[in-house]
C-alpha cells in the first residue's frame, strides 16, 4: 500500500490492482498531472484506505487476491456510497462470465487492458468532474 502525495489541492485517486508495476506506473503518471495517487494490491488494502482517507476516484481491477473488484465495489458502497459513481474498472476479464453481469449492471466506465493513459485521464476528469 503506497500513499505518495501530490500537490495539496489535487484530487486523490486510489489505484487498486495486484499488478504492482502497472499501479506504480499509473501513480507516477497521475502525479505528473497533479493528482495524488495511492496504490493497493488487494481489495482488502483498498477498503482500509477508503475507510481512512478521502478518495475522489477509484481505478480498479476485477481479478485480485483476497477481495475481487466487484466485491470491493459492493463493500465501498456500504461505507462510502458516494464513491460508487467514481469507480473506473480496468480489467483483462471484462468478458469473463463471473464479471460480465456485474459490469453491465454498474453505471461506471469499464476499460479492457491494455488501455492508454490518455483514455484513463479523460475518464478520470469526467468521473471527478474537473
Q: What residue ranges belong to the model's regions?
A:
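Receiver (REC) domain active-site loop signature in two-component systems and cognate sites
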Residues: 64
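Conserved phosphotransfer cores of two-component systems
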Residues: 51-53, 76-85
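Non-catalytic signal-transmission and effector/linker regions of two-component phosphorelay proteins
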Residues: 1-12, 116-130
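A Lys-centered signature of the CheY-like receiver
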Residues: 113
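Helix N-cap/capping motif at the beta->alpha junctions
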Residues: 39-48, 69-71
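Active-site residues of response regulator receiver
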Residues: 61
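Hydrophobic/aromatic residues positioned on beta-strands within the core alpha/beta folds
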Residues: 90-91
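Two-component/phosphorelay signaling modules centered on CheY-like receiver
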Residues: 20-38, 108
Amino acid at each position: 500500500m503506497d500513499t505518495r502525495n501530490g500537490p495539496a489541492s489535487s484530487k486523490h485517486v486510489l489505484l487498486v490492482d495486484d499488478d504492482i508495476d502497472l499501479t506504480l506506473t499509473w501513480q507516477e503518471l497521475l502525479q505528473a498531472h497533479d493528482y495524488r495517487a495511492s496504490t493497493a494490491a488487494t481489495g482488502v488494502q483498498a477498503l482500509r484506505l477508503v475507510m481512512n482517507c478521502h478518495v475522489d476516484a477509484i481505478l480498479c481491477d476485477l481479478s485480485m487476491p483476497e477481495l475481487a473488484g466487484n466485491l470491493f465495489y459492493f463493500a465501498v458502497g456500504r461505507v462510502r456510497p458516494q464513491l460508487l459513481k467514481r469507480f473506473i474498472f480496468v480489467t483483462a476479464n471484462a468478458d469473463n462470465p463471473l464479471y460480465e453481469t456485474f459490469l453491465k449492471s454498474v453505471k461506471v466506465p469499464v476499460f479492457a487492458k491494455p488501455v492508454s493513459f490518455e483514455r484513463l485521464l479523460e475518464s478520470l476528469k469526467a468521473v471527478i468532474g474537473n
